[in-house]
């Protein structure tokens, strides 16, 4: 797996017949929003009431399209270049 696209976790098990092109990492969250709503303003009116809503939020990291693979790097692929910093001092 070192030189392959390791976009999925190593613990992922594929079921037979499952489409491998549609796999990705799926994370889902719920955002809960509580609001206090009142009617009538200062002069009276109806009592306040609470309103709660849960909003589903799904984050997905899909497999990159064919041709946009991440390239594995090894120590032989890394090129180190050294640059020297030139100090420019102006005299007044």
From Swiss-Prot:
Keywords, alphabetical: Cell projection, Disulfide bond, Sensory transduction, Vision
Tissues showing expression: Retina and pineal gland.
Disulfide bond as UniProt keyword: yes
Gene3D superfamilies, per database record: 2.60.40.640
One GO location term (cellular component): photoreceptor outer segment
One GO term (biological process): negative regulation of signal transduction
Compartments where located: Photoreceptor inner segment; Cell projection, Cilium, Photoreceptor outer segment
Gene Ontology molecular function: any one: phosphoprotein binding
Membership in a protein family: Belongs to the arrestin family.
Function per UniProt: May play a role in an as yet undefined retina-specific signal transduction. Could bind to photoactivated-phosphorylated red/green opsins.
Subunit structure: Homodimer; disulfide-linked in response to retinal illumination. Interacts with CXCR4; the interaction is dependent on the C-terminal phosphorylation of CXCR4 and modulates the calcium ion mobilization activity of CXCR4. Interacts with GPR84.
Protein name listed in UniProt: Arrestin-C
């Amino acid at each position: 797996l070192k030189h392959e696209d390791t976009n999925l976790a190593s613990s992922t098990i594929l079921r037979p017949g499952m489409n491998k092109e549609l796999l990705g990492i799926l994370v889902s969250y719920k955002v809960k929003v509580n609001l206090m709503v009142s009617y009538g303003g200062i002069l009276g009116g109806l009592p306040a009431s609470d309103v709660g809503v849960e909003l589903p939020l799904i984050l997905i990291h899909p497999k990159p399209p064919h041709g946009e693979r991440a390239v594995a790097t090894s120590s032989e692929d890394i090129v180190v270049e050294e640059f020297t910093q030139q100090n420019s001092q102006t005299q007044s």
